Amino acid sequence: MDDFASLPLVIEPADLQARLSAPELILVDLTSAARYAEGHIPGARFVDPKRTQLGQPPAPGLQPPREQLESLFGELGHRPEAVYVVYDDEGGGWAGRFIWLLDVIGQQRYHYLNGGLTAWLAEDRPLSRELPAPAGGPVALSLHDEPTASRDYLLGRLGAADLAIWDARSPQEYRGEKVLAAKGGHIPGAVNFEWTAAMDPSRALRIRTDIAGRLEELGITPDKEIVTHCQTHHRSGLTYLIAKALGYPRVKGYAGSWGEWGNHPDTPVEL
């Protein structure tokens, strides 16, 4: 029986430690090269978070080309029957973005380690400095559009009653007081709930337990299509992950995010 079949999308350190030797597991570390070298969860393979992005201005958060993803997932030993567990050390931004990429490649079996390395260390669980054996060369992938909202898609949906735009940036960015593009402000109709507000620092950066109710208060509800973004779809990786974990049926990441929207001459903006 699949060791992971009974688990929810968001799992706890004890769940992972009990399954570290599962043959189907691909454990992905999205911390930093220095942090990984210092010690990582046993068996984890390091992925430089920047490899999950296109990396080209003005919208570095756009999806990398298929060839780059095929190389990346080949290095991880990707196979359809695999179960991914993903973690970072910042509360879930990079890990959530990686989960978005798993949706893009059509991988349906994955989990997020709640609180990531922070929660693992808080429980004094084991670390390793060993490097996993190389997994192989590039794999053939089919990419799916459904997890992603393009700029044109979002422009066509603005004002729809069944749309909620979740802006994961800071309130200062949302209000146009801190400007990181040609234009400041936010996408018309967007609701601001900063990604860090979804974390519980008293519980080692785990997702706060009252998050469903908080989103309900903001009108970010399961009956709507959720499109979430930040500046580069890094911070909004966490908010994408949270909506998925809550079972929201229609969730998209706007990969271009404010880097694209705020630098495009024809996009509407609210302050």
Curated annotation (Swiss-Prot):
Its EC number is 2.8.1.1. Keywords: Cytoplasm, Repeat, Transferase. GO terms for cellular component: cytoplasm. Gene3D superfamilies: Rhodanese-like domain. Pfam families: Rhodanese (PF00581). It is an enzyme of class 2 (transferase). SMART domains: RHOD. The active site is at 230 (cysteine persulfide intermediate). It catalyses: thiosulfate + hydrogen cyanide = thiocyanate + sulfite + 2 H(+). It is found in: Cytoplasm. Substrate binds at residue 235. Residues 21-129, 159-270 form the Rhodanese domain. One of its GO terms (molecular function) is thiosulfate-cyanide sulfurtransferase activity. Contains two rhodanese domains with different primary structures but with near identical secondary structure conformations suggesting a common evolutionary origin. Only the C-terminal rhodanese domain contains the catalytic cysteine residue. This is Thiosulfate sulfurtransferase. It comes from Azotobacter vinelandii. The gene is rhdA.
